[in-house]
Amino acid sequence: NSAKAICPSGASTGTFEAFEKRDSNNKKYLGKSVLNAVNLINTKISKNLKGQNIHSQEKIDAIMINLDGTKQKKKLGANSILAVSIAAKKLSAKEKKIPLYKTFLIKKNFKLPYPMMNIINGGAHANNGLRIQEFMIRPDRAKSFSDAMRICFVVIKNLQKLIKKNGLSTSVGDEGGFAPMINNNNQALDLIVSAIKMSGFVNGKDVSICLDVAANELFKKNKYSIHSKSFISVDKSIKEYKKIIEKYKIKSIEDPFAENDWISWNKLCLLYTSPSPRDKT
């Protein structure tokens, strides 16, 4: 038996993320090939995993992590380690003759999480000038995963119609969302709200809007250019967040500030969560 696995890759990555090994000096693929990562799998990793029990996932992962020996997987590369780890898990399921999901700790009452669909791309995922990287929808009142997919499909199709109606392109960005040539976050949000309504749903109840800002890309000298191309202070940025959260009933925001800017993150969180005594101090 055999199993295959592939690893994801992203256009915008944080300082603390696991390292992706690429052949930066290989001109054939403009430095984007992974021949060295594949070679490490076929030699170093393979040599150390030979003879291991395919069902001992924790041990397999521990061997590779220890073999690398760095916090961010910089020697072997996270793409080498993760690909082997996933392939091992898939092969274990195949050997046991059970579906992959049944090899995890949960033994009954299996449930799929509802998806957050990335439907408009901006930031590093598109070249349209939108500051926010991902505009997503979440089908909050779906009765099942298939119903969630249906709801998202209907909203996406109606969004496509609205974008065309506005004379804009329905080309897509890096992650499959539409990337119309607009440079105003509110215009993107207005389109999504209209698509939700056009689909027969209520924004903020049936379907909610969620954002991935990727604010690291929009941070300079303690200021942010999240809401327009102009860099403004943290306090002004939070006021702008407050406006769109309340106007568009935003339910989730990923990376609203730079990865090390915990003070700004806390300020925003305290506006919309019940703080513990420690948070208040």
Predicted segments, located by residue:
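Metal- or metallocofactor-binding catalytic centers and their adjacent structured scaffolds
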Residues: 8-94, 98, 149
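Conserved phosphate/anionic-ligand binding catalytic regions in large, soluble enzymes, centered on
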Residues: 73-93, 114-130, 174-177
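Structural signal for hydrophobic packing residues in well-ordered secondary-structure cores
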Residues: 42, 46-53, 64, 68-72, ...
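Glycine-rich, aromatic-flanked loop segments that form ligand/cofactor-binding clefts
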Residues: 109-121, 202-213
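Metal-dependent enolase-superfamily TIM-barrel catalytic cores that perform enediolate-based chemistry
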Residues: 126-271
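Single conserved hydrophobic/aromatic residue that forms the stacking wall/gate
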Residues: 272-281
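Short, mixed charged/polar active-site loops
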Residues: 2-4
